[in-house]
Amino acid sequence: MNTVNKPFRKKDAMQLVTGQPVYMDDLVPADCLIVKLLRSPHANAIVKSINTAVAKKVPGIEAIFTWEDVPQDARRYTQAGQTYPEASPYDRLLIDRHVRFVGDVVAIVAGKDDKCVDKALKMIKVEYEVLEPVLDYHTAKDNPILVHPEDNWESLCPVGGDNKRNLCAHDECGSGDIDAVLADCDVVIDHVYHTKACQQAMMETFRTYCSIDLYGRLNVLSSTQIVFHARRIIANALHIPKSMVRVTKPRIGGGFGAKQTAVCEVYPAFVTWKTRKPSKLIFTREESQIASTPRHEMEIHLRLGANKDGRIRGLDLYTLSNTGAYGEHGPTTVGLSGHKSIPLYSNAEAFRFTYDVVYTNHMSAGAYRGYGATQGLFAVESAVNELAAKLHMDPFKIREMNIVHEGDVMPAYYGAVNTSCTLDRCLAKVHEMINWNEKYPRRDMGNGKIRAVGMGMAMQGSGISGMDVGSATLKVNDEGFYTLLIGAADMGTGCDTTLAQIAAEVLECGLDNITVFGADTDTSPYDSGSYASSTTYITGKAVEKCALKLRSQICKLGAQLLDCSENDVEFDGKTVFTSADPSKSVSLGDIATASMFGHDIPLEVTETHMSPLSPPPYMVGAAGVEVDTETGEVKLLEFDACVDCGTPINPNLTRVQAEGGILQGIGMTLTENVTYDQRGWPMENSLMQYKIPTRVDVGKVRVEFENSYEPNGPFGAKSIGEVVINTPLPAISDAIYNAIGTRFYELPITPEKIAMAVAEKEGAV
């Protein structure tokens, strides 16, 4: 292959590294209205009265909007960017009189500059009827205090939700008699695993600019992963026709799932629609910490049964998920905690997976890389590591005995067949990379320092089977260069580049010969959006189909110009020539020119792709740590990983994706945490309190690939974006156990917890 599986530089690399104006705030006019939000100081309250009269008199203030400007009996909406029919409940109003978490919106203020808006915010007088909040998600279900007591709460899908029970979603599924199987097992690992909420903490905070175009339509420029869903969400929130909304995206400074929710778009959109003046809203870092969409806090009760020889026979998993004040992504993230963890051990005789998603008066949770699988894999893989220790077996060996293989049916993965898999080879590769036999389980280095290793596996999916849609439009321009129009959003992942590589491979041209444009709801073909690990697998396949069809059209017009049958010509990327006589040819440039006059064969093609399958990528990771038993400090000396993502379209970008995801998983394991005080106030409201790891906080990170070939993906590709975050959690946790002999069932594992565990073990506590 000429371009696929080759390490091309990102198409936008030079623009980004030289600081060119490519992000939202670089592109908006300086004289637009500044929009800011007044937020609730209470976790649960009713706005009894709100006085904006004095604030409106501040010079420069254009408008102030409150719940009185939003019909409270109107149909609600969700800010979750999801494919139809939208699993997340319609439980929001643009401004609700009932505020449900600390940071919920009370008023929207718009003015000519920051100074006047900040002054006006301080002058708004609000009287609240403070209500008792639901802050413990263990007691939320069937609690007499309702987070959503309203009657116009609406669930579009049968997800088991009931707002009068504080229940966002509920389901259960299984195969076989799990209770009988577990009763017959020699060993049962039975624990509750707790993963806290954590923030995506992308460099670029939430931001949106809105204006009215010459047709009177609302134009929205937003840092979003989901332009088409954002259009629907804005229209629903403002109760205007979708045809009156256009959404485009600039370059995005990271998202990791946060921007799969329309966190900020509706507020400047409302201001601009009402005032007919351009406006922008840029979240501060504090706002992005206290009023965004962090990962769902989950508690997972897992029972895992096995025989004495290490054969895993059954898994019983119950997940309790805290969706917070609103239900964005609540019904969908929770499913992955079981459906993307249990299938790793599909040879088990039985499984059961049950879950509840509950409302609380915490910040609304949402999408974050891994999307529920991360939490479930921490539980399942930690249990398998504990099983190995209990049976005195090597963690690699016990997995070799039990893992899913290519061709296996996966009952817990909706009964799908595992169409491509090199998980066994990934295990062998990581075993070799970290030099496991020499380092496992621990080495005492003296001076209270112990080095140890641990490992874990992961799987994810490639898009949402039977639902996600990706589309692409390809056209030949004069002189024979191509334009690729996509609806997927490049969030810094390089999807513009990888999709162009797929097209270039089919069309046998150089990568620079393809310009990429996206995403714009007016001009791009429909795409579900850049989430669910779908871009390469779903949109990439649409690009491949589109390029093949365009290639056929080029040959058809070329044959017409050569006065012969289409079956008698070939195309080498530069010319169309007759098979019998290659000297009889016509250049691509001449074909492009001919398409513009006197011919009716179009050189513009649009193709759409939907896959009934979501083939899992797989990953194995191993961590080497050094634990200081006196201070509890953990140094990550190395992390070695091997990924099966099918055919990597661009190995450089694929490796960078893996390295970034691993770092995020390390943070979730050791430092990152979202906590609340007794009033429901978020404690980590800046990056001083919310500790994300930097590159200097970790040692060597090495990533290799064991390529499978996925027959349903473009050139054999599967996804890469999410699976990479999942293995650090069980791997580092097990390494710490091997170092100090104490297992941790709650994340993050902080130095304080480790020091206390060591002291307790030594009898000091």
Residue ranges and their predicted role:
Residues 6, 12-15, 82-85, 161-208, ...:
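Glycine-rich loop/linker segments at domain edges
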Residues 1-160, 274:
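Flexible, low-hydrophobicity surface segments
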Residues 232, 253-276, 280-282, 495-503:
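Thiamine diphosphate
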Residues 67-68, 239-244, 274-279, 308, ...:
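C-terminal catalytic domains of large/alpha subunits in multi-subunit enzymes
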Residues 14-15, 122-129, 133-135, 225, ...:
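Extended active-site and interfacial segments that coordinate phosphate-rich ligands
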